[in-house]
């Protein structure tokens, strides 16, 4: 019921609302329901994500470098915690936090409001979409007892339907979709990813007290380089915001080229800096060194 009939019906509800309102989208809005295990493969722990991976890498590779956002929905008619969350890639977190500041969350749905989490996780299709170079989000569903007691079982039924939660998610993601549709450039703040990387380097250093001296000597220079990249990324994001807020003029050919370049950078960030540990948690490649046994 929750996984994932409610998500599919929510897609229909959002699109019907846009059509009935007469809204004319600026971008093409593609509606996809591609996460069913029937699309999966045998003897694979990633069967649930095979549908999304095949869609974006094999069936529609032309989406890569063109689509500015992916909104994924999972179990959206049940409150998995007292606080709702939009989970996204690092690069979209700042934009989403500012978006959420103007959202009124009904207390009967989520008493503790709404927050933004990053990075995305592997247990839903937005991960496959993101590593193809499309900035992705999902309504966070990983917390709470439902995932341990009812998920993927016959107990996932209409008894756990929460209308206030479902209505709020309809309204929240319709508003987010329209907000994204009105942007000129994809709202990507690359500094967030590099800041997380800087923190990760420091954590790895602390975990490797017996690292070779030549490695330890290079760490300060590495951290300084990351800081400089963050400064450049901050300036880039300021320019993106200026264009999206229409505080500076930009002709369409230039904007189209900028959008493609931003999405190209995003794809490279995924290619170079996103890896998984043995528990399928997202981490940085250099973090693997801290998982190796010491001599």
Where are the model-predicted features located?
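Short, Lys/Arg-enriched charge-dense amphipathic segments
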Residues: 47-58, 92-96, 131-143, 205-224
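Hydrophobic transmembrane alpha-helix bundles
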Residues: 27-29, 33, 62-77, 104-113, ...
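Mature extracytoplasmic or organellar-lumen-exposed domains after removal of signal/transit peptides
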Residues: 190-191, 197-295
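Short, structured coil/loop segments at alpha-helix boundaries
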Residues: 49, 60, 84-97, 104, ...
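Active-site-adjacent substrate-binding region
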Residues: 67-70, 75-195, 199, 206, ...
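A sequence-level detector of short, solvent-exposed, charge-rich linear segments
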Residues: 29-37, 44, 74, 86, ...
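Acidic/histidine-rich catalytic neighborhood of metal-dependent amide-processing enzymes
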Residues: 1-91
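Sec/Tat-exported extracytoplasmic proteins
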Residues: 15-22, 33, 59, 103-107, ...
């Amino acid at each position: 019921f929750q996984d994932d009939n409610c998500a599919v019906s929510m897609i229909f509800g959002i699109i019907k609302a846009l059509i009935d309102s007469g809204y004319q989208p600026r971008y093409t809005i593609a509606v996809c329901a591609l996460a069913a295990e029937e699309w999966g493969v045998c003897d694979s722990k990633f069967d649930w994500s095979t549908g999304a991976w095949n869609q974006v890498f094999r069936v529609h590779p032309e989406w890569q470098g063109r689509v500015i956002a992916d909104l994924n929905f999972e179990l959206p008619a049940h409150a998995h915690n007292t606080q709702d969350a939009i989970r996204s890639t690092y690069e979209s977190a700042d934009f989403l936090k500012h978006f959420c500041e103007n959202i009124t969350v009904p207390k009967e749905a989520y008493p503790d409001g709404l927050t933004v989490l990053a990075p995305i996780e592997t247990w839903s299709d937005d991960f496959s979409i993101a590593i193809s170079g499309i900035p992705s989000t999902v309504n966070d569903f990983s917390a709470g007892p439902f995932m341990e007691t009812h998920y993927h079982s016959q107990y996932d039924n209409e008894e756990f339907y929460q209308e206030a939660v479902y209505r709020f998610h309809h309204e929240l993601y319709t508003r987010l979709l329209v907000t994204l549709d009105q942007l000129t450039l994809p709202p990507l703040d690359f500094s967030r990813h590099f800041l997380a990387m800087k923190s990760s380097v420091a954590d790895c250093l602390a975990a490797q007290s017996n690292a070779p001296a030549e490695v330890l000597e290079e760490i300060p220079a590495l951290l300084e380089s990351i800081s400089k990249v963050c400064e450049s990324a901050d300036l880039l994001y300021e320019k993106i915001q200026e264009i999206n807020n229409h505080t500076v003029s930009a002709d369409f050919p230039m904007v189209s080229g900028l959008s493609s370049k931003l999405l190209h950078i995003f794809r490279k960030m995924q290619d170079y800096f996103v890896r998984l540990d043995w528990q399928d948690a997202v981490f940085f490649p250099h973090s693997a060194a801290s998982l190796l046994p010491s001599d």
